[in-house]
Amino acid sequence: MSKRDYYEVLGVQKGASADDLKKAYRKLAMQYHPDRNQGDKAAEQKFKEISEAYDVLKDDQKRAAYDRFGHAAFENGRGGPGAGAAGFDFNFGSGFADIFDEMFGEFMGRGRAGQTSNRGADLRYNLEITLEDAFKGATTTVRVPTSVACESCNGTGAEGGSTPIACPTCNGHGKVRAQQGFFTIERTCPACHGVGRVIKDPCRTCGGQGRVRKEKTLSVNIPAGVEDGTRIRLAGEGEAGLRGGPPGDLYIFLAIAPHRFFQRDGANLQCRVPIPMTTAALGGSVEVPTIDGSRAKIAIPAGTQTGHQFRLKGKGMSVLRSPARGDLYIQVVVETPVNLTKKQQELLREFEKAGQDGLHPESEGFFAKVKELWADLKD
């Protein structure tokens, strides 16, 4: 059974904002949550479906992959939600537990204990590469503005070697409870904002954040055969976590610059090559460039027309994680001579006078059909 469109599952438009997605998910999750529909298998399945849809659409990277490839973005080797294009594993992390705790922790008295640190944000970096780099692979460096752990406090956020203490308001749990009727309402602690710890003496360098802004220089390995839009994950190279929390990841988005000779079609390459009229008429050979830097010679049969295509097997792009290569397709364009000398013009006129019957079968056939059409119109 084919999966439903994720936007349809949540009942939102494709261009819905993050807030719209969250509101739609909260409403549906409250309606179909198993605790409210005990024993109802249909509701349980519906809850799983909307959870899966929200898990993908709430994440910018996974949503972009879904918008481009649909459900196929997470199948056929892409490894499910959290895998990237071309098989790279990006492990975005669902974050479903966060919204679950936010909704049902407060409503039903659930929720995780507060943590002393928060994970850093993931970062995106757009990198343009050449077609040659995509063909053979490359190693390049990027400079990324980010945040790193504060050296003064070793990322703790506390000044002078002191350590954070348990929040006295929530006793280190990160949440406070209040009884309302039959329900126990659990909310994020307003004193520590859910961290469970407070800093009495904040670090003067980072202001108690445990991290500072800095530009990092990183090396990026680009494998041979990558395509436009491929994403590469550099684990742990995102923003530093808050007060010693784990860092996020950095995602490199590749864009392949246009090439002056070649156009790419998957693993194949296409190239238009002009040839002289005389070569097309009499036959001959031409040398053409290839993506690996070598030259290939093509034999041009006599009578070759514009648009004729030659295939050079194995002269195309590399295939990711494979020794195979695509093909190179050469399309010839017969060039009409310009700026003829008087002598050249005379020779062409002599050629024309020598007789044209059978020399131009396509044009002769075309005009023969035109004459027939005119004759039919007169009748």
From Swiss-Prot:
Zn(2+) 1 binds at residues 150, 153, 203, 206. Residues 5-70 form the J domain. Binds 2 Zn(2+) ions per monomer. Its main location: cytoplasm. GO terms for cellular component: cytoplasm. GO terms for biological process: chaperone cofactor-dependent protein refolding; DNA replication; protein refolding; response to heat. Pfam families: DnaJ, DnaJ_C, DnaJ_CXXCXGXG. Its cofactor is Zn(2+). A zinc finger (CR-type) spans 137-215. It is found in: Cytoplasm. SUPFAM superfamilies: Chaperone J-domain, DnaJ/Hsp40 cysteine-rich domain, HSP40/DnaJ peptide-binding domain. Zn(2+) 2 binds at residues 167, 170, 189, 192. CXXCXGXG motif repeats lie at residues 150-157, 167-174, 189-196, 203-210. GO terms for molecular function: ATP binding; heat shock protein binding; unfolded protein binding; zinc ion binding. Keywords: Chaperone, Cytoplasm, DNA replication, Metal-binding, Repeat, Stress response, Zinc, Zinc-finger. Homodimer. Participates actively in the response to hyperosmotic and heat shock by preventing the aggregation of stress-denatured proteins and by disaggregating proteins, also in an autonomous, DnaK-independent fashion. Unfolded proteins bind initially to DnaJ; upon interaction with the DnaJ-bound protein, DnaK hydrolyzes its bound ATP, resulting in the formation of a stable complex. GrpE releases ADP from DnaK; ATP binding to DnaK triggers the release of the substrate protein, thus completing the reaction cycle. The J domain is necessary and sufficient to stimulate DnaK ATPase activity. Zinc center 1 plays an important role in the autonomous, DnaK-independent chaperone activity of DnaJ. Zinc center 2 is essential for interaction with DnaK and for DnaJ activity. Belongs to the DnaJ family. This is Chaperone protein DnaJ. The lineage of its organism: Bacteria, Pseudomonadati, Pseudomonadota, Alphaproteobacteria, Rhodospirillales.
